[in-house]
Regions:
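Secretory pathway targeting signatures of secreted, lumenal, and periplasmic proteins
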Residues: 37-77
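Surface-exposed patches in mature extracellular/periplasmic domains of secreted proteins
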Residues: 42-44, 99-106
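Short, hydrophobic/aromatic-rich segments at coil-to-beta transitions
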Residues: 110-117
Length: 192
């Protein structure tokens, strides 16, 4: 009986490990270099037949409580970057009605778009900010013989404590364009 229980537990562990397997759907590798740091692929998803998501964090961070996360999404199809972006902008506009912290700025250059936005997760009573998150998303049109669609490269910075949040607001006030410029300078990730 004890032996069966051990075998059962080992099989369950393997099952759950298989469920958490990270797949490099976009063939970008298990590392991504941004701002002179190497980020490790820690999560991926293929939630629809034409939609792929990959997330990278620094090796010493946890995906549940990261300081900076790199995300790369690809939506396959005959889509324009502006169409993909507009649904997020609509969501932000709707959320702003209940959350005054939410703010965004959009940038446009040729057929590329960037969205720099702040969101927060608040306590149930709305009196306390639990997580402050700043995101800079850059949308590219991909049109190669093998792939056609919209690629999103994003950087997500999070703050969890009052000190971290004050620092984030200070950066937004004094050095807001630093992160925007770093995201502008990246080359389009070469997905396969």
């Amino acid at each position: 009986m004890k032996r069966r229980l051990v075998l059962f537990l080992m099989l369950m562990v393997q099952f759950f490990m298989a469920q958490n397997k990270v797949e490099d759907y976009l063939h970008l590798g298990d590392k991504y270099r941004f701002d002179n740091k190497d980020y490790k692929l820690v999560w991926s998803s293929h939630p629809a037949s034409n939609f792929y998501k990959q997330e990278y964090i620094l090796p010493n961070e946890n995906v549940e409580k990261y300081k900076r996360l790199i995300l790369i999404d690809f939506i396959e199809g005959d889509l324009a970057p502006k169409d993909v972006l507009s649904s997020l902008v609509n969501n932000l506009e709707n959320s702003k009605k209940q959350n005054p912290i939410i703010n965004y700025q959009m940038y446009e250059r040729e057929d590329e778009y960037m969205l720099d936005f702040i969101i927060s997760k608040n306590s149930q009573d709305g009196k306390e900010v639990l997580i402050l998150e700043r995101n800079v998303y850059r949308y590219f049109r991909i049109n190669t013989p093998k792939r056609k669609g919209v690629l999103l490269f994003g950087v997500s910075d999070r703050a969890y404590t009052k000190k971290e949040m004050d620092n984030m607001f200070s950066v937004l006030k004094n050095k807001k364009l630093d992160l925007v410029n770093k995201v502008i300078q990246i080359e389009v990730p070469k997905i396969k």
